Amino acid sequence: MNLRIILTVAALLAGTGAATANCYEGLGCDDSQYFTTQALQQGTCQQLWEVRNMIYQQNGYCFQTNRAKQSFSNDGCYINDQASVRLNVYERKNVATIQSVEKAKGCK
């Protein structure tokens, strides 16, 4: 199963309001395993953006940009300030690693 299919399924599940972690083949579960730079480098900029924002969505973040609002529902969100989103140690590290790979790839 490729990352795109897993992201699509995860996006559908995220809209259910369930506060659960997303797990990705080749990466692991975003709230209990560290993603590796090597594994993340296999993804596209779009996939990296989606995985990173899924972490914020599952933790209650209300997206501000039109792109994110169109990709992720703000239904059930309750945190407007991204800095106030409580991420566990795995999620924080995974977001940082994703951002590092996005930067190295020149993602916008």
Where are the predicted features?
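Compact alpha-helical subdomains of small soluble proteins
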Residues: 63-108
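Hydrophobic helical h-region of N-terminal Sec-dependent signal peptides
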Residues: 8-12
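Bacterial N-terminal signal peptides that target proteins for export
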Residues: 1-7
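Amphipathic alpha-helical packing elements
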Residues: 39-73, 77-78
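Acidic/histidine-rich, surface-exposed loop or edge segments in extracytoplasmic proteins
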Residues: 27-37, 77-82
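N-terminal signal peptide c-region/cleavage motif recognized by signal peptidases
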Residues: 15-18
